[in-house]
């Protein structure tokens, strides 16, 4: 028995277009799709909904290998269900990343709780703990902690691209469309999905402003750098095909000419130029990190950077603030040179 994810067109506004079904019969996996419907009604972003669907598809395939069905019965759930699922993923070859394992376990946990609210906790009790909640007035009453069934995620130290790397990578592009995309990531800090979701009316060149739909469909307005304004203007006047679509960035050639540029197309574009220039770390998210680091070097405040990047929590912004060892050395040298405290000298 095999399962896969399909996208269906439905007039029902309360039904998710993404469905997990049996491959041979097309029968839906009810408990999974009911959870997807709930998240769809909550207006979960399309990319997040797709991630949930494929995470649950992986769980269903694992469950079917043990129980010979994709349907989950409340009596089959035990306190070690998700722990067993986590162990299965950890033993997989090639290994899954820690963040992938954690995301899949978390989604399966929520979907099972949604379907069986009175069933035994599918997370082992040993992973539950009480903690004292810290509030504005100090420590409050004990509360049950969230599930600690998580694989430790190694801390990544993403070093921003150097000026030379950015220049070499950018010199490989030939169209204003591609340069405008790079400019929006490097000078505005946009995510890949934010760039691809831009429409023509989101660009206000006369006011040098850009309207961006971020995660959770949250809107924010960003100032446009003069270089980005020039590239966008050139692309819209001279390169963009005269098509009826509202999309800003469209395919420029081939059968898909005039249709909205896809994530696969964007990845292919960056992959090609990485191979051409030898800049192996040049990817959309690395440009976003470079944007944050450049603004920090320029003296921007963290609250302002948080607004520009579309973060809801400043702790998320702090993870993007990475400076190079050369920056640390230069700032240290500058600080030491400004010291007025005399240093002890050896006695003669």
What are the residue ranges of the model-derived segments?
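Basic, Lys/Arg- and aromatic-enriched nucleic-acid-binding interface segment
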Residues: 159-192, 218, 243
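Flexible interdomain linker/hinge and immediately adjacent N-terminus
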Residues: 120-168, 213, 252-257
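C-terminal catalytic core of tyrosine-transesterase DNA break-rejoin enzymes
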Residues: 183, 288-312, 319
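C-terminal secondary-structure termini that scaffold catalytic or DNA-interacting sites
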Residues: 3, 335-348
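Conserved tyrosine-mediated DNA breakage-rejoining catalytic core shared by Y-recombinases
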Residues: 188, 193, 197-230
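Catalytic-site neighborhood detector that most strongly recognizes the C-terminal catalytic loop/helix
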Residues: 309, 314-334
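Active-site/catalytic core of tyrosine-dependent DNA strand-transfer enzymes
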Residues: 226-279
């Amino acid at each position: 028995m095999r399962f896969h994810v399909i996208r269906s067109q439905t007039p029902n506004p309360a039904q998710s277009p993404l469905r997990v079904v049996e491959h041979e019969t097309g029968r839906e996996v009810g408990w999974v799709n009911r959870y997807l419907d709930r998240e769809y009604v909550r207006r979960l972003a399309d990319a997040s909904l797709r991630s949930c669907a494929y995470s649950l598809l992986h769980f269903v395939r694992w469950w079917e290998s043990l129980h010979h069905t994709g349907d989950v019965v409340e009596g089959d759930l035990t306190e070690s269900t998700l722990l067993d699922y986590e162990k299965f993923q950890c033993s997989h070859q090639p290994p899954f990343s820690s963040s992938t394992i954690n995301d899949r376990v978390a989604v399966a946990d929520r979907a099972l709780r949604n379907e069986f609210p009175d069933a035994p906790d599918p997370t082992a009790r040993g992973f539950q703990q009480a903690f004292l909640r810290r509030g504005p007035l100090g420590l409050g009453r004990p509360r049950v902690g969230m599930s600690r069934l998580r694989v430790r995620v190694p801390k990544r130290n993403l070093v921003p691209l150097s000026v030379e790397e950015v220049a070499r990578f950018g010199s490989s592009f030939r169209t204003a469309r591609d340069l405008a995309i790079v400019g929006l990531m490097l000078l505005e800090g946009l995510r890949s999905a934010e760039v691809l979701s831009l429409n023509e009316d989101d660009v206000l060149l006369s006011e040098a402003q850009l309207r961006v739909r971020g995660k959770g469909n949250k809107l924010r307005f960003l100032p446009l750098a003069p270089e980005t304004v020039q590239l966008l203007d050139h692309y819209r006047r001279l390169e963009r095909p005269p098509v009826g679509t509202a999309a800003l960035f469209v395919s420029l050639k081939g059968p898909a000419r005039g249709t909205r540029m896809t994530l696969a197309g964007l990845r292919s574009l960056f992959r090609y130029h990485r191979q051409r220039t030898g800049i192996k770390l040049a990817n959309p998210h690395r440009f976003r990190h470079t944007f944050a680091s450049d603004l920090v070097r320029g003296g921007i405040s963290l609250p302002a950077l948080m607004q520009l990047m579309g973060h809801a929590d400043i702790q998320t912004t702090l993870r993007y603030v990475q400076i190079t060892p050369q920056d640390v050395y230069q700032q240290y040298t500058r600080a030491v040179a400004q010291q007025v405290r005399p240093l002890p000298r050896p006695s003669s």
